[in-house]
From Swiss-Prot:
Residues 15-33, 43-58 have a biased composition (Basic and acidic residues). This is Non-structural protein NP-1. Pfam families: NP1-WLL. Keywords: Activator, Host nucleus, Transcription, Transcription regulation. The lineage of its organism: Viruses, Monodnaviria, Shotokuvirae, Cossaviricota, Quintoviricetes. It is found in: Host nucleus.
Length: 213
């Protein structure tokens, strides 16, 4: 049989319960104050994460609008200046009057890219038109086009690798690679990377072919 508690015991228990409740309430208030001081939401007086994000987005948009416009103008100005090896080497040759033919890693990598673009616009396009029926081509025909492209790429890369690996020390490679490395060292590191369109690449390919004739 459970013993009934005396008034003293009952009062003592109530005091402890009240003390524990007060302590818990103080801890809760302390944590709330700490959270408010650290929370970016409460620090701005916002009620929700969404409203705070909206505030931050508006501030970012307003503060970044003018710098972004300047960057856009700078980007436009940068794109007007071409920095392909062909342009850089042509300008250097005009100033230095050197009679060395274009060569080197940067030159040949540009030639390969130009040749690939030229092959798509000319060689493969003509092959497709000759094989297509009602403007369509089955998988066998597509495979023939792909192998045609592969044959060209294999030949180009094989010749370039032979030149660099087994062709011996090339004075032209050393000279023109050094020219382009010096050019890259002087280019603004914060400028926007130049984007070359397919038509511009085709023009570069034609210019490269004309320079080699």
């Amino acid at each position: 049989m459970e013993r009934s508690r005396s008034p003293r015991e009952t009062g003592s228990t109530s005091s402890r319960d009240k003390s524990d409740a007060d302590w818990s309430e103080r801890r809760r208030e302390e944590r709330t104050r700490t959270w408010k001081s650290r929370s970016p939401i409460r620090a701005h007086g916002e009620r929700s994460w969404g409203s705070w994000r909206s505030r931050e987005k508006n501030q970012s948009s307003s503060t970044a609008s003018r710098p972004y416009q300047k960057a856009t103008r700078k980007e436009t100005a940068t794109k007007k200046t071409k920095h392909t090896p062909f342009n850089v080497f042509s300008a250097h040759r005009a100033l230095s009057k050197t009679d060395l033919q274009f060569c080197g890693f940067y030159w040949h990598s540009t030639r390969l890219a130009s040749k690939g673009t030229n092959e798509i616009f000319n060689g493969l396009k003509q092959s497709f038109q000759s094989k297509a029926i009602d403007g369509k081509l089955d998988w066998e025909g597509v495979g023939e086009l792909l192998f045609e492209q592969k044959k060209c790429l294999d030949t180009w890369y094989r010749n370039m690798m032979y030149h660099f690996a087994l062709g011996g020390d090339c004075e032209k490679c050393n000279y023109w690679d050094d020219v382009y490395k010096k050019h890259l060292a002087n280019v603004d590191t914060y400028s926007v990377a130049e984007e070359i369109t397919d038509s511009e690449m085709l023009e570069a390919a034609e210019a490269v072919d004309a320079a080699n004739q």
